[in-house]
Every structure is written in structure tokens, then in C-alpha cells.
Amino acid sequence: MLKLYYKFNFATEPKLTYPNNHTNHSNHDNSNFNNEALKFQLLEELPQSIQNYLSNFEVTEIEIIKTVLLKAKTSFNNTIDSYYLLEDMEIEILHVLKRFKAILIQKNETVEAMQGYLMKSLKSEFAEMHTLNKRRDHLPITSLFNQ
């Protein structure tokens, strides 16, 4: 319902005015659209579940997390004789990111301040996954039906 207001000017007749409740939503909408476009561009080559989770972070946080993630993967792959893709470690990465977010909340820290912690956590998780894969590769193949 539109409310009308009267402004009285004693020198002349009353003037009919409309309240100016209009806020400029176009700038806000445009900013959100730009952020979503930047997020899409940053996340597009990551596995889908990681994209979905990281899309909840701010653009600057995503830039830091993605950089740390790719450095951790490269560093880890350089130290072993195998090569893992992000898709090979998708579940492990997602678990690390969820724990990382919980630590950020508990310690009331920024992504930038905790990027060293994220790097160590990712490399540790990758090493554990690699160790489990190597153990699995060396286990004898047995079947419950052959006993």
C-alpha cells in the first residue's frame, strides 16, 4: 500500500510527496552476480563436491584455499612415485575442508591466517590415503567364497 505524505509550506499550498523507500538493489544484485561469476571461474576445474562446498566461502577465501590445495597436491605428488588427481582424493579433501572450516570457527581465525594449517592437514591426509592404497595393493587377493 502506497502511503502519501503532505509537506506543509506555510507560504504556499501543501505539496503531495511520496516516501523514498527505494533502495538501490541493482548494485547489490550486480555485486552478487559478479561474485558468483568469479566463484564459478575459480572452482570450475575442481571436482563437483569440492566446488559445492567451497562455493559457501568468499571469493578471496576460495582463492587462498584453491592455491593451498593445488600446492599441497603438487608437493605430495612430487614426494611419491605415484600421481594422484584431485578426483582420486575428492572425499579426503572434502573431509579436510570441513574440519578446516570447524577449526576456523572454533579459533575465530581467517582462512589467510590458517593456510599453513590447511597445507599440513591436506598433505597429512594425502599421505594417509597413499599408505592405505599401498597396503591394499600388497594384500593377497582372497575371497570369502574360496575358503
Which sequence ranges carry the predicted segments?
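Charged low-complexity intrinsically disordered patches
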Residues: M1-K71
